[in-house]
Regions:
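N-terminal presequence-like segments and the immediate start of the first folded domain
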Residues: 1-71, 76-128
């Protein structure tokens, strides 16, 4: 069973949001690389919820859960959605990560995703 130690580096200061500076993985038998997930929806929050439901489904299919996540990479189409994304995480991440140890996350703003209606995509790395 993998041990994932989520931690911040004091010399780097506090992270800007709900993420940690690094995840140290030891004892992993397997590493999961989950493709960027997209979800339909009429608004940004609906897409975020759908994306993370799909990630949870993928994790469960491999016998994993939120505690197995070592890193997220998030792609947003519009920079004005950053506050919405942060608000969504503030509301939902405590349910997903009740210990308050949030995996590292890289947030990128891109020109577009694979199809126009999609506003958010999240890629995940997990360890078992």
């Amino acid at each position: 069973m993998a041990e994932i130690k989520i931690q911040n580096v004091e010399a780097l200061g506090q992270p800007l949001g709900q993420y940690s500076h690094m995840a140290r993985v030891t004892g992993a038998r397997e590493t999961l690389y989950i493709a960027g997930m997209l979800a339909p929806g009429d608004d940004f929050d609906a897409q975020c919820s759908g994306v993370f439901r799909q990630i949870e489904t993928a994790l469960k299919s491999a016998g994993a859960g939120w505690g197995s996540v070592a890193q997220f990479t998030t792609y947003l189409v519009h920079s004005q959605d950053i506050p919405r994304f942060m608000a969504w995480r503030l509301r939902e991440f405590p349910k997903m990560f009740p210990d308050g140890k949030y995996p590292p996350n890289t947030l990128l703003i891109v020109d577009r995703l694979v199809q126009e209606p999609f506003l958010v995509e999240v890629q995940t790395i997990a360890a078992l």
